[in-house]
């Protein structure tokens, strides 16, 4: 299998609308965003990688980001330095091609190059997301905590991978 090329996304990207649509199609596991919110997240990101125009997206922040997500803040309270994966999503038609794994591999290289020693994220525990659980476990992530979000309507597992 050929490894797909990744590229970085910035706010001026013409495909932002396609990426936003990809995000919002998967809002049950991510969160629904407006165009303005999505553009702000991309602009604030440590790494915003995409494969093709909108086959896969990984959006992450480092510890200094101006971001008020309760999950991001959970990590900020516990670690001085980290890269937080806010969302990773693959289009339904592109699943099974290794795109998310490729984006994570690119993120790990860039995070190490920037002097980071850990990448963190959260995965839904309730409602469960077994595909994401298995994927992150295969990448070497381990659970470091749990928390309730959205007025206790969701429970998440906080995960960490040392680089």
What are these regions (language model features)?
Residues 146-163:
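C-terminal "cap" of GNAT-fold acetyltransferases
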Residues 1-37, 52-55:
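Short amphipathic alpha-helix that is part of the acyltransferase structural core
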Residues 59-87, 151:
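Conserved acyl-donor/pantetheine-binding loop and adjacent beta-alpha core of acyl/acetyltransferases
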Residues 44-62:
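Conserved beta-hairpin
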Residues 86, 91, 124:
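Residue-level recognition of the GNAT/N-acetyltransferase active site
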Residues 111-125:
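Conserved GNAT acetyl-CoA-binding A-motif
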Residues 90, 96-109, 138:
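Conserved acetyl-CoA-binding loop-helix of GNAT-fold acetyltransferases
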Residues 125-145:
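Conserved active-site alpha-helix within GNAT-family acetyltransferase domains
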